């Protein structure tokens, strides 16, 4: 199973290329807007990938920039892909723009390096664990009736990426995640058993950073998305860092490089995958299973 094109990723690549063409031509956004009788804000929005352009609008823009040949064909192909809708658009009213963008990156990434400091990362969560996490958000920001169920459904559907043979997923979880209670004890036991099963996937490397480890990477959870290297100049890595109610997207070469170095440092300080598996099993059995059984007795 491989991933089809993500409209989110294509739109961002197209936006970056069109912005680069305008700058190479020495034209301002206002001058392009005036020539095409578009509003300056339209130029700004599509160059920041806030909105998309219809394929015919891209063709008109390329005519103005006098772009022909293979480069034109590539950009028009990106425009066609960007105009498609991802499955997550079915839930558009329930999802923030940041979250839709995140799913779009996840949908097409060739690799993901995930560091989670507080909870199990979303693509590895059980339904019960996810429901408790999402329900907890409503204590900060009340959610409309039915929203929690839809959000859980989206999270579970995201997990289809685990079945992609072309995805390489590396996950480092802080050891505290294994002992931080989410829901009741049975939820935690089942979640840790799920981590053990997912850790056996051939395309997934799961490591635990022990509490005794000495490392220099502190701060929020983050994901580094890597995209296919197919000699396409429009490919670039993306980093997303998580905040309380939103996320921050970083695309600069320096930022993506620093986060890759940070992830490697975390991985180096972590237990090996077999050692991590043993720790997860031990925690599930000694910390949650026995306590669960005693509580149920």
Can you say where each PLM-predicted feature lies in the sequence?
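Short secondary-structure junction/hinge motifs that connect adjacent elements
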Residues: 34-36, 93-95, 279-281
């Amino acid at each position: 199973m491989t991933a089809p094109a993500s409209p989110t990723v294509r739109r961002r690549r197209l936006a970056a290329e069109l912005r680069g063409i305008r700058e190479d031509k020495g034209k301002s956004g206002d001058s392009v807007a005036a020539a095409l009788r578009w509003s300056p804000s339209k130029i700004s929005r599509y160059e920041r990938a806030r909105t998309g352009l219809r394929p015919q609008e891209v063709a008109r823009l390329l005519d103005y920039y006098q772009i022909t040949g293979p480069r034109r064909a590539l950009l028009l192909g990106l425009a066609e892909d960007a105009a498609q809708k991802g499955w997550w658009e079915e839930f558009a009213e329930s999802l923030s723009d940041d979250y839709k963008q995140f799913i779009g990156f996840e949908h097409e990434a060739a690799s993901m390096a995930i560091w989670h400091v507080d909870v199990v990362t979303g693509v590895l969560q059980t339904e019960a664990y996810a429901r408790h996490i999402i329900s907890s958000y409503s204590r900060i920001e009340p959610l409309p009736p039915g929203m929690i169920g839809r959000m859980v459904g989206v999270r579970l559907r995201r997990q289809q990426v685990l079945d992609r043979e072309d995805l390489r997923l590396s996950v480092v979880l802080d050891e505290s995640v294994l002992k931080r209670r989410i829901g009741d004890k049975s939820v935690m036991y089942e979640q840790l058993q799920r981590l053990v099963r997912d850790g056996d996937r051939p395309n997934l490397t799961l490591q635990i950073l022990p509490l005794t480890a000495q490392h220099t990477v502190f701060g929020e959870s983050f994901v580094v998305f890597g995209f296919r290297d197919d000699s396409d100049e429009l490919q670039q890595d993306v980093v997303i860092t998580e905040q309380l109610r939103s996320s921050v997207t970083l695309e600069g070469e320096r930022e993506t490089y620093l986060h890759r170095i940070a992830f490697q440092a975390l991985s180096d300080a972590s237990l090996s995958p077999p050692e991590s598996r043993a720790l997860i099993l031990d925690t599930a059995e000694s910390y949650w299973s026995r306590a669960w059984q005693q509580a149920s007795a």
